[in-house]
Structure formats: structure tokens, C-alpha cells
Amino acid sequence: MSTILEVRNLKKYFNTKNGLLHAVDNVSFSIEEGRTLGVVGESGCGKSTLGRVVLHLLPATEGQILFCGEDISNPKKAKLHELRRNMQMVFQDPYSSLNPRQSVAEIIGEPLKVYHVCRSKQELDERVREIMDTVGLPERYQHSYPHELDGGRRQRIGIGRALALNPKFIVCDEPVSALDVSIQAQILNLMMDLQEKYRLTYIFVTHDLSVVKHISDDIMVMYLGVMVEKTS
């Protein structure tokens, strides 16, 4: 298997009134295509920040990021737009990560519109229905709004939105921590099925050891911004 993501000496520091906060401090790792790297640690250890820096949702202080062998450490705007097609994120809170003014179909269809993937409204509608079916959302919900659905279905919307552009790589930031235990297993199994079907590569961020054991091929432990252990 080929290496899809390589991170070298990545740092992310924040200025605070007490000096520099080393949220991510000299972290290095690589992920092979089709595998899941579980990143586990207590709250505040820097694991979510790491995922956001890898996706350029936050700028790195220092370090190198390679995606499919290409250095993407400081991408220009056009390159970053291109990277968004292949690098996506599923957020922790399905309650706040979705636009409350958009319907399910509009949320999932928005990336397709931004990237001009579909040539007609009919093609767009068909693609949205296909994605909804893939993530286990019945067609009857396409005109529903996020507040009308439970947490599990909201997270399925977030997963569908992330899948819309057929990415290669997804950062999953505590995607089941806000859900009931009974729903957590359903979402985890869905994500594993999607990974097998589409050969997706995940960084799976969590504080729950049982979750990371269930879904991960490799596990990285973080503490105070530092990688303290990595196992396969």
C-alpha cells in the first residue's frame, strides 16, 4: 500500500497571555492508503488541532505535510481549493456543524455546486439522493432541516456532505462523542463500510479508547501536544 499522508515535525503554537501554547509540538507520522489512524488523548492534548492543521483549517507554525507525495505545506488558494476535493472533515458536533437554514438536500448538494460537479439540476438531485442512500438517509428526509432530525441522522448528513466530492482522505473529529451509545455503533459501522467501499483513509480523533480500538488500524497517543506513542 502507498503512503497517502506524511506529516513531518508539525507544530502549531498559539499566543496566550501566559506565553506560547504548544498545541501540536513536533509531531511526525504517516498513513497508508485505505487505513485508519486513530488519534487518542485527553481533552486539550492537541488531537483536534492536529486534524485541523493537516486540513489547513488552521495554519501550521512549522513543519511539512505531504499528500500523495506532494508537499502541501503552504498551498496557494487555487491549490487549496483543489485539495478540498480530496481532503474532507466530519465534525464532532452534528448540531452546530450544519447550516440550520439549509435542507438536507441543500447541505449535501452544496459541495457539488461549489465544484460544478453536476451539469444539471436533475443530475444534482440524483447525486444527492444517491449520497443519502449511501449514508442511510431515506429520501423522505431530503427536504427536512437539521433541527427536525436526531443526532444520528444529523451526523449522517455530515458524513454525506464529506463524501459528496469523492475524497480520498477524511479527518473524523470525535464524530460519535455527541451521540447516544446505541447510535455510536451504527455510525462507526457505517464509516467502516464506507471506508471499505470507497477505499477511504481516515484520521479518527477520539478520547474514547473503546472507539479507537474498534475502528483503527494504527493508534497514536497524544499528550500535551506531543505524540507519546504509536502502535499498529
Mark where each language-model region is.
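Conserved ABC transporter NBD signature motif
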Residues: 63-71, 83
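Conserved ABC ATPase "signature" region
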Residues: 71, 116, 122-140
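Conserved ABC ATPase signature
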Residues: 145-149, 153
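P-loop NTP-binding/switch modules centered on Walker-like glycine-rich loops
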Residues: 42, 179, 183-232
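A short, proline-enriched helix->beta-strand linker immediately N-terminal to the Walker B motif
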Residues: 164-168
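Helix-to-loop junction immediately C-terminal to a conserved catalytic motif
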Residues: 55
